[in-house]
Amino acid sequence: MHLAAAAATSLSIAVSPTGAAPWHHATLTCGPVGGTISHRAAACRKLSGMRAPFAPVPRDAVCTDIYGGPDVARVVGTFRGQHVWAVFRRRNGCEIARWNAVSFLIGNGESPIR
């Protein structure tokens, strides 16, 4: 893991299995590794190998019409020194794939504090 990238990562995570209260909250920092999320070091390693884990689904993406549930997750903070404000939902195949790519952070609808 690059130290500069790790030092510039500080995330606040909120997850709701219903899209409404109650929300489950967790944090993650990388460089040094810290926060309340389980498996912090592994999460930092996974993030360091990802190109753009918080990028939205492209507007021109062709997505399957599949519903994955009412879950909502929000990730706010910095990643590699860049501001992050990302919302994850499971409303179609593209959004489900995007959610699954960072499920080590946001879980599968349950609390990320495992």
Residue ranges and their predicted role:
Residues M1-R114:
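N- and C-terminal low-complexity/disordered segments
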